[in-house]
Amino acid sequence: MAKYIMAFDQGTTSSRAIIFDHSGKIVASQNQEFKQIYPKAGWVEHDPMEIWGTQIGVAKGVIEKAGINPEDIAAIGITNQRETTVVWDKNTGKPIYNAIVWQCRRTAPICDELKNKGFDKKIREKTGLVVDAYFSGTKIKWILDNVEGAREKAEKGELLFGNIDTWLIWNLTRGKVHVTDYSNASRTMLFNIHELKWDKEILEELNVPEQMLPEVKPSSYVYGYTDKSIFGVEIPIAGDAGDQQAALFGQACFKPGMAKNTYGTGCFMLMNTGEKAVPSNTGLLTTIAWGIDGKVEYALEGSIFIAGAAIQWLRDELRIIDNSPQSEEYALKVEDTNGVYVVPAFVGLGAPYWDMYARGTIVGLTRGAKREHIIRATLESIAYQTRDVLEAMQEDSGIKLQALKIDGGASANNFLMQFQSDILGVPVDRPQVIETTALGASYLAGLAVGFWNSKEEIEKNWNVDKHFEPAMDNEKREKLYKGWKKAVERAMKWAEE
């Protein structure tokens, strides 16, 4: 009996492979960063061949590192940076353009056009998403409109579209399988989340041929097998979910009202709403959490575009820290931010503001403002943005959050997590395994092949590593938060022509 599950965690800045055992513990992990391409201001791309190369490289590397054989792997689960768009030639297998990354703002004018026509209401109702350059639909349109010969090839059925999950599965099966799961499909802005199919009216409006699109399957399902030439054996590819939905699953947030926040490049908060798609009146997204056991479950999501990336900015651009963990050390050297607020709206603001033209802002500077204050204010901005999202979620769902489960790289920052608990006024729980994105993909894959039998079995694997209790009084909490709201106002609409 195969003893392990392998997860591919293909992220925005690195490709990672992790091997898990039956108790959900990490046996071995390997990751490799790849190149970020910035052709123009606000444009972000990746090379899909480099993504495939790094992903397969770490997969082979981690098998060796774990000292196991490929036949010891019961299944592969895939989780991915969502919305990032690849269009490739189905005969040559070569991309016709770089992958357009979720952070890329180049399609903002297309989005403005849709809004001016009033088509955004229709998109909101059908897909649960707001019209934004973030999602795949307008990115596909851009490629078809701007790459020479692309539209003709697409009409002839020679081109395929996929998000990163689809691109990896297509390559793993050597072109045999062109598939995605419900969670990833729900991020394209082309998928009707109520009827569970590609929406013809939206496809027509964006002029995207349906034949380019992958088949949509449950998130826990045997999609196909890896080609023998890759690992020497055929391994079932049995789990697929977008990174945030996978993290919700990995955190065992199986009941309505359970929520998690992932602190990665961006911050993503999801609340399970069960079999009901809850529409949002506060600018959150209604999205598919996963499809499993013959049914689909939904979630409310608030996306914060810049979280960990703000700490990278302190390190790489401002050069006021040498590494990310140092941010905690410096933040603790001062009592507070001395009235400084940083609004890291480098690529606009996500939920609940959705302002594509907001830009990064530092306010409240005085002669006494030091490096430590700016570092601390940058960390605090992550917690404030999370509170913005949580308030919107509670309003939409009518559910008051009891505790927040956390994961992702920056959740290891104890200063930030304590401040998060303080500013929310609810307990925050960090699990022992913070690689919950990869863990969720593993669980989905393992359930499909009988490696695990039920969600209940998985739930028993979840254990708390550190519990944070709010230690701030309400008056101080509200005063600080009011200052944040004022700072956000200053950042909004900055780049409008």
Curated annotation (Swiss-Prot):
Enzyme Commission no: 2.7.1.30
InterPro entries noted in UniProt: ATPase_NBD, Carb_kinase_FGGY, Carb_kinase_FGGY_CS, FGGY_C, FGGY_N, Glycerol_kin
Gene Ontology CC entries for this record: cytosol
Lineage top rank: taxon: Bacteria
Keyword flag ATP-binding: yes
Catalytic activity of the protein: glycerol + ATP = sn-glycerol 3-phosphate + ADP + H(+)
One Pfam family recorded for the sequence: FGGY_N
Gene3D superfamilies noted in UniProt: 3.30.420.40
Pathway: Polyol metabolism; glycerol degradation via glycerol kinase pathway; sn-glycerol 3-phosphate from glycerol: step 1/1
GO BP term (any one): glycerol-3-phosphate metabolic process
Annotated residues for binding of ADP: 12, 16, 265, 308, 409, 413
Keyword Nucleotide-binding belongs to the record: yes
Activity control: Activated by phosphorylation and inhibited by fructose 1,6-bisphosphate (FBP).
UniProt binding sites for glycerol: 82-83, 134, 243-244
Annotated ATP binding sites: 12-14, 265, 308, 312, 409
GO molecular function per UniProt: ATP binding; glycerol kinase activity
Keywords in alphabetical order: ATP-binding, Glycerol metabolism, Kinase, Nucleotide-binding, Transferase
Residue positions binding sn-glycerol 3-phosphate: 12, 82-83, 134, 243
Oligomer status and interactors: Homotetramer and homodimer (in equilibrium).
Function description: Key enzyme in the regulation of glycerol uptake and metabolism. Catalyzes the phosphorylation of glycerol to yield sn-glycerol 3-phosphate.
Protein name, UniProt field: Glycerol kinase
Gene source species: Thermoanaerobacter sp. (strain X514)
Gene: glpK
